Amino acid sequence: MPATETADKNTKSANSDTSGRVVRVTGPVVDVEFPRGSVPDLFNALHAEITFEELAKTLTLEVAQHLGDNLVRTMSLQPTDGLVRGVEVIDTGRSISVPVGQEVKGHVFNALGHCLDKPGYGEDFEHWSIHRKPPPFEELEPRTEMLETGLKVVDLLTPYVRGGKIALFGGAGVGKTVLIQEMINRIARNFGGTSVFAGVGERTREGNDLWVELQEANVLKDTALVFGQMDEPPGTRMRVALSALTMAEWFRDEAGQDVLLFIDNIFRFTQAGSEVSTLLGRMPSAVGYQPTLADEMGELQERITSTRGRSITSMQAVYVPADDYTDPAPATTFAHLDATTELSRSVFSKGIFPAVDPLASSSTILDPGVVGEEHYRVAQEVIRILQRYKDLQDIIAILGIDELSEEDKQLVNRARRIERFLSQNMMAAEQFTGQPGSTVPLKETIEAFDRLTKGEFDHVPEQAFFLIGGLDDLAKKAESLGAKL
C-alpha cells in the first residue's frame, strides 16, 4: 500500500486526550478553549459528555477553524441540546473515522460510523479516517469500458462508463431517486460485486424503503449503507458522503474489488456545506453558496476513481434547484462527470418513464472508437431525428402538422415512435404499475432503433411502442393492435 494511504489511516497524534472547555454554543457551532500549546489540528474529532433529559450521550465535534488565543471553532455532528458553557471537551487526536472491512456489508451506519441496525456493531473493526487523499496520479487507470444497464435510453444514447462518475440530474419530483433505486436493482444484481450507498440529506422514509427492497432482492448482503438524512445537523450531512466513500475505498484498495458507490443526493452535500460555511461566518459566494464550493466538490470527486485493476463506479443523483442548470451546485458537479442523464419535466409530463431528455444527456464514451461504429451511427441518427422534431415544434404549434412537407411529416411520426420506444417499465416501479420491469440487451436495442429510424415500423401504431421492452414486446403489442412487424 502507498505510504500516503497508510498515513491516512486512523492513527492518534501526540496531543491526544487533551481537554478544553466550551466557551460558546450557537446552534451546531461550538467554540472551545484549550490550554496553551495544546490546540487540536483542523478536522480533529472532539468528544463532549453531556446529559439531556436524563439521557447521557457523547457529542462529537469536528474542528473547523482556529480562532487564535487557544480558541477553536467546531461543528457538531449531533444536536447540541444540553451542551452548556464550561463542559469539558476531549481532543481525540484524530479525525472522524469509520469501520471498514468485509463485515460492514449488510448493515446501516451513520456518518460517525455507528451501526444503526445493530448498536455497538463494528466498534472493534479497523477504522479509517474519512479525510483521505486521492490516489497518486501514477496509480490512476482511466477506463472506457461500457457498463450495460438494460435500459434502452441509457445504453443507446448515454452509455455509462465502468469505473466512471455518472450523474442523474433533475428538478423536484422527476424520478431521480426511483432511477437510482432502479440502477441498484439492475446493476447490483448483475454486477456481483460490492455496493455502498450514501444517503445524503434525503428523506428517512426513502432510506427505510431501500433497506427493505435490498433485503427482498437478496442484495443487502453485498451492500453497505451509510445515512445522514435531512433531519440531521449540517455537519453530518456534509460528512456522510466522505464516510461512505471511505468504506468504498477500502474495498477498492485493500480487497482489490470493483465497487459501486451510489450517492443520493449530491446537491444536499453542497447545501450542507453552504449551511456550515454561513454558520462559520464565511463570506458567501455566488447565489449564497460557500466560497469553497469547487474545492469541497473536488475533494470528494477526486477520490472516486479507478486505480490499477480496481475501480469505483459512482452513480450520483443531483437535485437541480428550480430546474436551473446554471445554479453553481449542479454546474460545479458537471466538470467531474463521465456521463450525465438529465431528467426532464417536459418528458415526465408526457408519461414517458424514465423521464430522460435524450438531447440534454451525454456520455464521454459515445464514440465510435469505444462503443463501435454501428452503435454510434444509430445513436446519432436517433438524436438527429429527435432534434429535428424539436426544431419543428413551434411550426406545428402555430400552423399545424399539415403545413409540413411530406418528408418532415414522416420524420415527426418516426420521432414520436422513438420517444415512446425510449420508455420502459422499471423494476423499482413494479409495485406501482403492476407491470414487471424489462431488461433489453444492448445488441437488441441497437437493432430495434436501427430498424425504427429506417422506417421499418412506420406502419405500427404509436401506442405499441409505449412502456415496453425489446422487439418481442413490440411484436406482441403491435399484434394486439392489429399490426405486424
Swiss-Prot record:
Amino acids binding ATP: 170-177
Segments traversing the membrane: none
GO CC list: plasma membrane; proton-transporting ATP synthase complex
Protein keywords: ATP synthesis, ATP-binding, Cell membrane, CF(1), Hydrogen ion transport, Ion transport, Membrane, Nucleotide-binding, Translocase, Transport
Stored Gene3D superfamilies: 2.40.10.170, Bovine Mitochondrial F1-atpase, Atp Synthase Beta Chain, Chain D, domain 3 (1.10.1140.10), P-loop containing nucleotide triphosphate hydrolases (3.40.50.300)
Record GO terms (molecular function): ATP binding; ATP hydrolysis activity; proton-transporting ATP synthase activity, rotational mechanism
Highest taxon listed in the record's lineage: Bacteria
Signal peptide range: none
Protein localization: Cell membrane
Biased composition (Basic and acidic residues): 1-11
Chief place where the protein resides: membrane
EC number: 7.1.2.2
Region (Disordered): 1-20
Pfam family, one: ATP-synt_ab
Top class in the EC scheme: translocase
Membrane topology: Peripheral membrane protein
Catalytic activity: ATP + H2O + 4 H(+)(in) = ADP + phosphate + 5 H(+)(out)
HAMAP family named among the record's database cross-references: ATP_synth_beta_bact (MF_01347)
Family classification: Belongs to the ATPase alpha/beta chains family.
Assembly and oligomerization: F-type ATPases have 2 components, CF(1) - the catalytic core - and CF(0) - the membrane proton channel. CF(1) has five subunits: alpha(3), beta(3), gamma(1), delta(1), epsilon(1). CF(0) has three main subunits: a(1), b(2) and c(9-12). The alpha and beta chains form an alternating ring which encloses part of the gamma chain. CF(1) is attached to CF(0) by a central stalk formed by the gamma and epsilon chains, while a peripheral stalk is formed by the delta and b chains.
Function: Produces ATP from ADP in the presence of a proton gradient across the membrane. The catalytic sites are hosted primarily by the beta subunits.
Name the record gives this protein: ATP synthase subunit beta
Lineage, opening ranks: Bacteria, Bacillati, Actinomycetota, Actinomycetes, Mycobacteriales
